[in-house]
Amino acid sequence: MPVVRLSQAFVPTLKEAPADAQVASHKLLVRAGFIRQLGAGIYDYLPLAKRTLAKIEAIVREEMDAIGGQEFYLPALHPAEIWKESGRWEVMGDNMFRLKDRKNGDYCLGMTHEEIFTAIARDELRSYRQLPQVWYQIQTKFRDEPRPKSGLLRVRQFTMKDAYSFDVDRAGLDKSYEDQRRAYERIFTRCGLDFVAVQAHSGAMGGSESSEFMVRTDAGEDLVAACPRCRYAANTETATSRLASEQDGAGLPKPEKFATPGVVTIEALEQPPYGVAARRQLKTLVYVADEKLVVAVVRGDQELNEAKLQTATGAQVIRPAHPEEIPSLMGARAGSLGAVGFSRAKVFVDPSLADRKDMVTGANEDGFHLRGVEVRRDVLTGPHATVAELRTVRAGEGCPRCDGTLDVFKALEVGHIFKLGTKYSESMKATVLDADGKAVPIVMGSYGIGVERIMAAAIELHHDELGIRWPPAIAPFQATVLTLGPEPELKKAADELVKALSDAGLEVLHDDREERAGVKFKDADLVGIPLRISVGKKGLAEGKVEWKLRGDKAVELVPLAEVARRAAEHVRAGR
């Protein structure tokens, strides 16, 4: 194996992290000389990062090929027409980088490649006999992220492995999806990640089912609800829970209006003279779903989950209504809104409210509320009212599958798999002839992995106050040899040891710089190569060198003649 000499290598380590770096992976990747920032959400990957990313990509390729994947490399520049076929040209909104060529043609930089792969399938696949197919690529993607931050965790240019399965029916899709799920588990395990697969929201991708692969870390921006008893786990965008039952009063024969001047918040209605607990209030919110106003109702002490509302509405895009949009629909401003007897728009009510009585809500008249509201009688009888999961689950609520209690924690998404079904094949007219000679839409799946996110997630999980502690399979080198002095005999012994390690098949970084031992030790800990072997004057006098594993405090003296064999065995054991 080739040897890299640190005296000749480009590894620009730093003593301090950038002032704007907040998460460990960002701080350490910059300090250890792996990345540099070019612009907001745009990073240079330096030689050490390129080595680690190449190892991650190799693992991904091995596991994709093992399930019959065939690798492609498709353009990052896409004509607008193909995105318009699927309807996503408008859906992607400002997240998509768009540009025009010199002939004023519309193009975009690809965020993902469902449309492109579907077009190939449409043009080339004719019969069910050609299915199943599993196609993938490892390629650069672009997203006009509004708030790039956290180093490689939220960027505008990134590398993704995106795979696509093509089957003749749902049973085939189920098998392809399961193959991908198992492959993802192997990939993340080999990369040293502690992960959990969770139920997820499909979002703009669409489809009937999706799962995310999450790494538990405070650097994550997603929230996962999980039950330690039965292993239930879901992104809070889809998670459900059991709530403790509420004891409502007898209520009133019909809602009764009462004056609440100046009361426009849940908290204000809790105060005297009203004293209405938040759990007895109906929170009524107005949203715009695909340019149509809709109403969502959750309990006063609960939070609306926008992803769940998007699922309930079936909309491609949702947003909170602007204050000026609300009065024309509701007859009042925010703070006095309610859905009693409301029929001017679709109304979605969280199931935890369906059987509640004696509730309080806005009267759709500024300065007034209604008491004695019975949700099923007064809200759900509306012509456009329906029950739908809307609220965000919280830690301590009951598990929906067993009598356990949910934990809610931050997590980082490193992979996402989708059952797309016929969403793209129908809109783009990608069909094959089935066994009966009938044209049927191809049934598709989509499967993504963030390559740089694996690298960053590994650091979030494996680091200490000294630096990175790379999982062996994705470390930039397997061993580093430190020459601890200028003496010719030390240099000669180190050179011979490095050659022996290389001949034994190890990837070695040789720190042969004219630097103090303390500097070399600090850089070795910072860069995080799993095995450190130090050639010093004292040990060499006894025919030995120092052997230390990154993360272990113990330093062992090992006979020089045994080091190469022992190191090779150590690497083969995956340590």
From Swiss-Prot:
It catalyses: tRNA(Pro) + L-proline + ATP = L-prolyl-tRNA(Pro) + AMP + diphosphate. Its main location: cytoplasm. Belongs to the class-II aminoacyl-tRNA synthetase family. ProS type 1 subfamily. SUPFAM superfamilies: Class II aaRS ABD-related (SSF52954), Class II aaRS and biotin synthetases (SSF55681), YbaK/ProRS associated domain (SSF55826). One of its GO terms (biological process) is prolyl-tRNA aminoacylation. GO terms for cellular component: cytosol. CDD domains: ProRS-INS (cd04334), ProRS_anticodon_short (cd00861), ProRS_core_prok (cd00779). GO terms for molecular function: aminoacyl-tRNA deacylase activity; ATP binding; proline-tRNA ligase activity. Catalyzes the attachment of proline to tRNA(Pro) in a two-step reaction: proline is first activated by ATP to form Pro-AMP and then transferred to the acceptor end of tRNA(Pro). As ProRS can inadvertently accommodate and process non-cognate amino acids such as alanine and cysteine, to avoid such errors it has two additional distinct editing activities against alanine. One activity is designated as 'pretransfer' editing and involves the tRNA(Pro)-independent hydrolysis of activated Ala-AMP. It is found in: Cytoplasm. Its EC number is 6.1.1.15. Keywords: Aminoacyl-tRNA synthetase, ATP-binding, Cytoplasm, Ligase, Nucleotide-binding, Protein biosynthesis. This is Proline--tRNA ligase. Consists of three domains: the N-terminal catalytic domain, the editing domain and the C-terminal anticodon-binding domain. NCBIfam families: PRK09194.1, proS_fam_II. Pfam families: HGTP_anticodon (PF03129), tRNA-synt_2b (PF00587), tRNA_edit (PF04073). Gene3D superfamilies: Anticodon-binding domain (3.40.50.800), Bira Bifunctional Protein, Domain 2 (3.30.930.10), YbaK/aminoacyl-tRNA synthetase-associated domain (3.90.960.10). Homodimer. The gene is proS.
